[in-house]
Amino acid sequence: MRPISRALSALILLAPLTTLAQTYTPKAIRINAPSTVDTAEALRIAALPANSPLTKQQIETALQRLADTGLFADVGYTVNSDALVIKLTPSASSQLQPAHFANFVWWQPADLESLLEAAVPGYHGQLPLAGTLTDQVKAALVSLLHTKGVDATVDAHENGFAADSVTLSIVSPSIVIGDLQLQNSLPALLPQLKTLQHRLQGQDFDVAETSRAVQESVNDLYRNAGYLDVNTSAPTHSAPRKDLLTYAVDLTSTVTPGDVYHVSSLQLHAQPPVSEADLAKAANIKPGDIASPAAQRLATSEMKLAYANQGYFDAKVLFTVHQNSTSHTIDYTCDFVPGDVYHFASIDTSALALDQQAAFARAFTVAPGIVADAHLLAAIQQALQSLKLGFPVRLGMVPDPSTHTVKIVLKTSASPAH
């Protein structure tokens, strides 16, 4: 129970009701509050009978109900020969957060809001950070679900949907994604879309999160196939159907692919020590290719590797993309910031048996201080091959940005015999 504020207590002391047994019959009960407060709703929450004798205890209980909602920062009252006046100071807007309903799929959002506003006095799409209003909304949701034949548990938590929001969701029974129908799908992408449908099926349904996941996932598949202007509509959902202990919701979205884009040009502003020719080979993007964000990401990775193979582990690859929506072409411009070259610091061979460590030390004679490039890695691999270990050994790289050095760590997936 939220305690009545000090302001309320002070006003009570000014009132003429000095004992619980005394009664007072007001000619009227009025609300003194800013215009933003719905006075009729406040009177509903107070629930004081009109034209009836009231005790001090009844009035204090009514005010406690108002305070407990969390909607008011201060609550008080005064009495005179004409009226009982309840004074309300609303909570600051920072103490109220919008409500998000995650998976109440039996209703459209606007219809659910209307039902809750009718059932819970004081609720208008926002919930206070403290108080009983959230619990009242949860109870109303449980009652509404009972009318649909669903015995449910409803939870509320902050920041589930977005920052500064309260998410209410059905936690039992589970509400999950059923079938996903994609209207206007391209036949060439059906295998990937089928994989996506199987991945989403059975996941928890959330009207906002599911919509975002469907749209982003479908759009990514199309964009990686060159359809950069693709638009996937927010999915509509069917009425829930019971599926064993869960309720499944079938989704339908329409895909508008647009035209496929192709690469018009790739300009590489190479920086030493990697040449433009080597970067072009690593990027493997040519005019006429389908313009794919996935291919661009792969090119970025491969060009960074080209610099890392020269000892430049901090190299940055900066793509600039110019999209021509008329010709449906893409021009790429790529700039490079190599950073500082890294040098070999040490090698950790502790994953090997002691005799193998000794044999490796004899085979690998490179001294620290050389550039940590592909030649260093080749020398390590050559030394490992000479040992004929019979199990794979991976090379782990541990760069130290403060000294621009690299420690090499040998890693094994199988434990060698000692």
Question: Can you say where each PLM-predicted feature lies in the sequence?
Answer:
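N-terminal signal peptide c-region/cleavage motif recognized by signal peptidases
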Residues: 16-18
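Interaction-mediating elements
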Residues: 23-418
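Bacterial N-terminal signal peptides that target proteins for export
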Residues: 1-9
